[in-house]
């Protein structure tokens, strides 16, 4: 299974980019041995439309244009379900074992995700009740993907 992160907004050079790259690299090392075909990250430019609804629609169209046709969509959304790392790993492991080709994780921009993307998501995940900037959500998601791989591999990184 290939994992794909599609994020509205760009990570500039700096600590967030360094952390994102670090977790992505760590996942590449362990994920391959677990049957994962990679972890791709695509960035979508933030819409410049004046109207928030129009921005959300434009960003949703850009996200869907990058998403594979056959996939499981996972929304990173403040209204999503809070799940622990072990449950997150269970989802990834189950989808891999079911021969799902692609699992796509969507991170919205400042206005969030469109209602259409929320409806299409198989799973909606929140990293707690707080609202996070998309840069931090991306780093936290990549860390959780890496952590999930270590859980599936029985690696000592996760000591939960």
From Swiss-Prot:
S-adenosyl-L-methionine binds at residues 76, 108. InterPro entries: Alpha/beta_knot_MTases (IPR029028), RlmH-like (IPR003742), tRNA_m1G_MTases_N (IPR029026). It is an enzyme of class 2 (transferase). GO terms for cellular component: cytoplasm. Its EC number is 2.1.1.177. It is found in: Cytoplasm. It comes from the Bacteria. It catalyses: pseudouridine(1915) in 23S rRNA + S-adenosyl-L-methionine = N(3)-methylpseudouridine(1915) in 23S rRNA + S-adenosyl-L-homocysteine + H(+). GO terms for molecular function: rRNA (pseudouridine-N3-)-methyltransferase activity. Belongs to the RNA methyltransferase RlmH family. Homodimer. This is Ribosomal RNA large subunit methyltransferase H. It comes from Nitrobacter winogradskyi (strain ATCC 25391 / DSM 10237 / CIP 104748 / NCIMB 11846 / Nb-255). The gene is rlmH.
């Amino acid at each position: 299974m290939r994992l794909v992160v599609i994020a509205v907004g760009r990570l500039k050079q700096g600590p967030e980019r360094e952390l994102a790259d670090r977790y992505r690299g760590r996942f590449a090392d362990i994920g391959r041995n677990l049957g994962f075909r990679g972890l791709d990250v695509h960035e979508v430019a933030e819409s410049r439309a004046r109207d928030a609804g129009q921005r959300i629609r434009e960003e949703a169209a850009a996200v869907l244009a990058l998403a594979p046709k056959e996939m499981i969509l996972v929304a990173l959304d403040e209204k999503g379900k809070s799940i622990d790392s072990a449950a997150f790993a269970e989802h990834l492991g189950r989808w891999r074992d079911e021969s799902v080709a692609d699992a796509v994780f969507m991170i919205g921009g400042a206005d969030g995700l469109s209602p259409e993307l929320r409806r299409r998501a198989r799973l909606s995940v929140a990293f707690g009740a707080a609202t996070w900037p998309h840069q931090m959500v991306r780093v936290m998601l990549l860390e959780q993907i890496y952590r999930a791989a270590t859980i599936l591999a029985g690696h000592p990184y996760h000591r939960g």
